Amino acid sequence: MDKRIAIVTGANRGIGTEVVRQLAEKKWKVILTARDEAQGRKACEDLAGRGLDVQFHRLDVTDPENIHRLAQDLKADPGRLDVLVNNAGVLMDEDRGSDRITIETLRRTMEANFFGPFQLSQALLPLLNRSDDARIVNVSSGLGQLSDGGGGYPAYSISKAALNMMTVQLAEDLKGRVKVNSVCPGWVRTEMGGPGATRSVEKGAESIVWLATDPMIPNGKFIRDRKEIAW
Ligand SMILES: NC(=O)c1ccc[n+]([C@@H]2O[C@H](COP(=O)([O-])OP(=O)(O)OC[C@H]3O[C@@H](n4cnc5c(N)ncnc54)[C@H](OP(=O)(O)O)[C@@H]3O)[C@@H](O)[C@H]2O)c1
C-alpha cells in the first residue's frame, strides 16, 4: 500500500513538531511546514536524522501567495494528500479583556487562526480529493467553546470558535469525501501553553494523531482525549 501522506502547519516547534514525529513514526510521509525557514528546516533535519520520512516546505498560513505556491508544489509532488493538520496558531491577547482588546490584535489573530486555515483547506482540497480516506484536523482550543469560552483571551477564543464553525461547515459540505474535526489538545507545555501547563507535547499531540490515523473517527465533531466535547 502507498504511504499515507500528511501535512502539518506551524511545525517548527511545540505540538506541531510532535504531531509530525508521531505520524512519521507510524511510517507516514509528513510534510513539515513553518513560516521560519531556518527553524523549519532544523526541525525537519532533526526528525529526518532519526530515519523518519519528513520533508520541509515553507508556509506562512496568513500569506495567500505562500498557500498558492505550496498547493502548486504539492500538486507536482507528491500529488496527493491524506491529512491536513491545521495546527499553526497564535495567542496575542496580552491580558486584555474584550472591552479593551485592539482591533489590530483581533484581526491578526483571526488571520492566523481562522482565515489562514480556511484558505489553506480550500487550496489543498484538490489534493485531499485524491485520497481514499481524506481528513482535515483543526487544532482548536477549549477556549473556543461557546459553552465554556470565558477565559480572558477574547481574540484567541473568538478565532477558535470561528475555526470550530469552519469545521462544522466543511464537515457538512465535504461529507463522504473528507472527514473534518476540531480537537483541543488540552493545556500543553509549549511556548504558548507555558512551563506550568499540565500536559506534555506527546499527550497534546495524541488526539490529533488519533483523528489523523484511526480508522473509526467521527466527522464534524469537537474532540478532546478521543471523546466528543461540547462546541
Ligand atoms: N499549548 C496549549 O496549551 C494549547 C492549548 C489549546 C490549543 N493549542 C493550539 O495548539 C496549536 C499549537 O500550539 P503550541 O502550543 O504548539 O504553540 P507554539 O509552541 O506557540 O507553536 C505555535 C506554532 O504556530 C506557528 N505559527 C504561528 N503563526 C503562524 C503563521 N502565520 N504561519 C505559520 N505558522 C505559524 C508558530 O511559528 P513561529 O515559531 O514562527 O511563531 C509555531 O510553530 C495552536 O493552534 C494552539 O492554539 C495549544
Regions found by a protein language model. Name each.
Residues 90-110, 115-118, 122, 129-176:
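Catalytic loop of short-chain dehydrogenase/reductase
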Residues 1-31:
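Canonical Rossmann dinucleotide-binding motif of NAD(H)/NADP(H)-dependent dehydrogenases/reductases
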Residues 37-38, 58-72:
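The beta1-alpha1 cofactor-binding region of Rossmann-like NAD(H)/NADP(H)-dependent oxidoreductases
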Residues 9, 81-89, 113, 138, ...:
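Rossmann-fold scaffold of SDR-type NAD(P)-dependent oxidoreductases
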